[in-house]
Amino acid sequence: MKIAEIRGMTPDQLADTLISLKKEQFNLRFQAATGQVEKTHRVNEIRKDIARIKTVLRAKAAA
């Protein structure tokens, strides 16, 4: 997910996206632990997307 995409979202959309990413991260962690994950790079992508969303949410809350 690109940062420009994230900045264009409303805080409600960001919160919804954050929840869905956390669920996906949870599922991928279990798959990784059992050795079933096929796209291992997706774990890092999701982690970084979560960080980006949290950063934008904080910036919007401060503004």
UniProtKB/Swiss-Prot annotation:
User: What InterPro entries does the record point to?
Assistant: Ribosomal_protein_uL29, Ribosomal_uL29, Ribosomal_uL29_CS, Ribosomal_uL29_sf
Q: Which UniProt keywords apply?
A: Ribonucleoprotein, Ribosomal protein
An example Gene Ontology biological process: translation
**Entry annotated with the keyword Transcription:** no
Any one cellular-component term (Gene Ontology) = cytosolic large ribosomal subunit
GO molecular function terms here?
Answer: structural constituent of ribosome
HAMAP family per the UniProt record, alphabetical: Ribosomal_uL29 (MF_00374)
> Which family does the record claim for this protein?
Belongs to the universal ribosomal protein uL29 family.
Instruction: State the protein's name.
Output: Large ribosomal subunit protein uL29
